[in-house]
């Protein structure tokens, strides 16, 4: 599943081809995604795109009439292609602009979404989201206060979008390993020093992943078709039974919150 670095990579890749250009039309070949594609999209003609931003794992295309909100789901991707490009089986949506290009959304599993709102502040999917992990709002004191009385596994806690958005499974695994904290540690038992270390590490891991163009494991490619190279930097994620890069012991895995978790039992003591 594309996480924050992958979505940020997509945003940076598509923005130069869309910002300040005009939507000529939106072609919807498959409206049945996770939620039905908003009907307003197919009515967009001669509408200028004024900006592109991201909130959590949502792409936001700001137009002069409202906002197109895209989510890549489990297997979705976006790319910029010439308007005469051949259409593949899972190419569900095209946003055609007046520069000879179009934004094409491909999604084999159809768990993504393309929605419309005229008021971003009241958009229902954003109302309960926590802070952005790279923002100043996400800091050690915030994490410490948020974790009090939380008798849940730390890994699950960090992947809760009401706590902090977009960190995701891969980057939570990597951050906990770097900090030497067991993924099953109860959130309420975090110390202030551990919160300080975690916040700084999460920010550092995410920034590095963005620089590398995200992590390509299966479905994700950058908008220009290249893979994300952060997979080459992964320390524990997907490395079950391989040597720990710190101590040489064996990396183990277990299921936490229905997601695969990878850790070193020697370097990440539970407690």
UniProtKB/Swiss-Prot annotation:
Protein's recorded name: Formamidopyrimidine-DNA glycosylase
Any single Pfam family the record assigns to this protein: zf-FPG_IleRS
Gene (UniProt): mutM
Necessary cofactors: Zn(2+)
Tree of life domain: Bacteria
Function in brief: Involved in base excision repair of DNA damaged by oxidation or by mutagenic agents. Acts as a DNA glycosylase that recognizes and removes damaged bases. Has a preference for oxidized purines, such as 7,8-dihydro-8-oxoguanine (8-oxoG). Has AP (apurinic/apyrimidinic) lyase activity and introduces nicks in the DNA strand. Cleaves the DNA backbone by beta-delta elimination to generate a single-strand break at the site of the removed base with both 3'- and 5'-phosphates.
NCBIfam families referenced in this protein's UniProt entry, alphabetically: fpg (TIGR00577), PRK01103.1 (NF002211)
Cofactor note: Binds 1 zinc ion per subunit.
Active site as annotated: 2-3, 57, 259
Molecular function per GO: 8-oxo-7,8-dihydroguanine DNA N-glycosylase activity; class I DNA-(apurinic or apyrimidinic site) endonuclease activity; damaged DNA binding; DNA-(apurinic or apyrimidinic site) endonuclease activity; zinc ion binding
Gene Ontology terms: biological process: base-excision repair
